[in-house]
Swiss-Prot record:
Protein name in UniProt: Testis-expressed protein 35
Lineage: Eukaryota, Metazoa, Chordata, Craniata, Vertebrata
UniProt-annotated location(s): Nucleus
Main location: nucleus
UniProt keyword list: Coiled coil, Nucleus
Signal peptide stretch: none
Database matches in InterPro entries: Tex35 (IPR027874)
Coiled coil: 43-79
Source organism superkingdom: Eukaryota
A cellular component term, taken from the record's GO annotations: nucleus
One Pfam family matching this protein: Tsc35
Tissues/organs with expression: Testis-specific. Expressed during spermatogenesis.
Length: 207
């Protein structure tokens, strides 16, 4: 059966070879007009969608630009305020610097008299110390042993004549014994001459 079928197919192919090759294939025929129309419709729809999308994007961009402008205006205002604030801070800093300079000068001027007084006191103290050291050097012997009078140096009192206290008279006679002794002592004479005129033995015999 299979061999008979194969032979029939061969004969049919030989007979119908020309007919089969020359017949047009319906599947390969296309309607170009319809395809063009469909393509145009598709393109028109796509362009409309693209245009709509572009419009939306433009609207969004314009909105964003307006927002950016508003933000820029706000930033400019804030920047102006910041600039004014910075200028105010600079002026305040200058005022504070001037006030600090004035306070520092006042403090220096107030400290000067105290410093001068302290310096003067220090000078006086040094001078007193030098005086004490010089006195200590004077009152010390060459060997370094202090003298006996280094503590309280008392000036010598003037010696008084004991006869003045006994006989303080100023106007008296020349024959006064005390006055004679006084004058003889002051002049450096011996005191026995004053006793000669008044001696009871002057007119009598000597022993």
């Amino acid at each position: 059966m299979s061999a008979k079928n194969a032979e029939l197919k061969k004969t049919n192919l030989k007979k119908n070879y020309k007919a089969v090759c020359m017949e047009p294939k319906l599947t390969q025929i296309y309607d170009f007009k319809g395809f063009k129309q469909e393509g145009l419709l598709i393109r028109k729809g796509m362009t409309r969608e693209l245009k709509n999308e572009l419009r939306e994007v433009r609207e969004q961009l314009t909105e964003k630009m307006e927002e950016i402008k508003q933000i820029k205006d706000i930033m400019d205002k804030d920047f102006d305020k910041l600039y004014e604030f910075v200028e105010i801070m600079k002026e305040m800093q200058q005022d504070m610097d001037e006030k600090m300079d004035v306070l520092i000068n006042n403090q220096k001027n107030n400290k000067l008299p105290f410093q001068n007084q302290a310096k003067e006191q220090q000078k006086f103290w040094q001078l007193g110390k030098m005086d004490k050291s010089s006195q200590a050097m004077i009152t010390e012997e060459p060997d370094g042993v202090p003298l006996a009078c280094d503590k309280n140096v008392v000036p010598p009192k003037p010696t008084r004549n004991p006869l003045e206290s006994l006989h303080p008279c100023q106007s008296c006679c020349e024959k006064c014994l005390l006055c004679a002794l006084k004058t003889n002592r002051n002049q450096g004479r011996p005191s026995h001459h004053a006793w000669v005129p008044f001696s009871p033995l002057s007119s009598g015999a000597a022993f």
